[in-house]
């Protein structure tokens, strides 16, 4: 990446984070003085934050792991190959709630896709996330897997609300990236996320994804336009 590309990426990242912070803090009726305090707190944290070497080591470990096959097994979760006969109903339930429906967001058609359309597409690879006791909690996917160009779009979802924000999404995503890079031979994994979803953006950056651009007013849901942030992981 040259200096110009790095400058553009940094500008996009700063703009994205700023918009996300404004959207979140507006819910708490922040005043000018509150934003000044927030800016000072960010500056203080930037000076004292831990080294990024541990995160870089984590990324290297993900990309250098051995080839995996189903079921993919981690410390707290497993990912098994999606089974239409046993998994369809529970996944379809997840995809009908406010968070789950983003998994079905289509950038290729005038409407959202359906679970049936996703699993009928031979270029889509789906995996069911479970706890170690086989309790289903979420879904991973590689969409439009391109063997010739070694790339695919990644999507993830923790469908059960009580299992969100507990680290399961990160562990499952690491397993899925390992499977994609070391078994499927992917050289690029990309994803799209709502630009003000700071939690998701942070998780993706921790796993090596970099901001590639902002798609302005890319989707229209509940009578509101949303900007999408595109992020990519390149395997050298």
Each PLM stretch: what is its role?
Residues 28-59:
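Short, charge-rich amphipathic interface segments used for partner binding and complex assembly
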Residues 2-27:
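N-terminal acidic leader/helix
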Residues 26, 30, 163-164:
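Residues in soluble alpha-helical coiled-coils and helical-bundle/repeat scaffolds
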Residues 118-123, 209:
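Short loop/turn motifs at secondary-structure junctions and domain boundaries
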Residues 61-78, 82, 88, 126, ...:
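Acyl-donor (CoA/ACP) binding surface of acyl/acetyltransferases
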Residues 39, 91-96, 115, 154:
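Hydrophobic alpha-helical core bundles mediating ligand binding, dimerization, or RNAP-core interactions
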Residues 77-105:
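Short amphipathic alpha-helix that is part of the acyltransferase structural core
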Residues 99-117:
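Conserved GNAT-fold acetyl-CoA-binding loop/helix
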């Amino acid at each position: 990446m040259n200096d110009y590309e790095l400058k553009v990426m940094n500008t996009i990242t700063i703009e994205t984070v700023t918009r996300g912070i404004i959207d979140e803090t507006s819910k708490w009726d922040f005043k000018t003085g509150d934003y000044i305090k927030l800016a000072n707190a960010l500056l203080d944290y930037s000076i004292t934050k831990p080294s990024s070497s541990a995160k870089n080591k984590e990324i290297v470990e993900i990309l250098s792991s051995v080839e995996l096959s189903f079921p993919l097994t981690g410390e707290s979760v497993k990912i098994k190959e999606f089974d239409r006969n046993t998994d369809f109903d529970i996944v379809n339930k997840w995809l009908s709630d406010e968070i789950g429906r983003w998994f079905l967001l289509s950038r290729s058609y005038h409407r959202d896709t359906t679970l049936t359309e996703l699993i009928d597409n031979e270029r889509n690879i789906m995996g069911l996330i479970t706890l170690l006791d086989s309790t289903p909690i979420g879904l991973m996917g590689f969409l439009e897997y391109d063997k010739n160009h070694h790339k695919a779009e990644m999507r993830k979802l923790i469908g059960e609300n009580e299992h969100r924000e507990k680290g399961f999404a990160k562990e499952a995503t690491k397993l899925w990236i390992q499977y994609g890079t070391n078994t499927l031979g992917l050289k690029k994994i990309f994803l799209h996320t709502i630009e003000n979803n700071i939690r998701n953006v942070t998780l993706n950056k921790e796993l090596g994804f970099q901001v590639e651009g902002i798609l302005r007013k890319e989707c229209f849901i509940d009578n509101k336009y949303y900007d999408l942030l595109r992020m990519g992981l390149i395997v050298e």
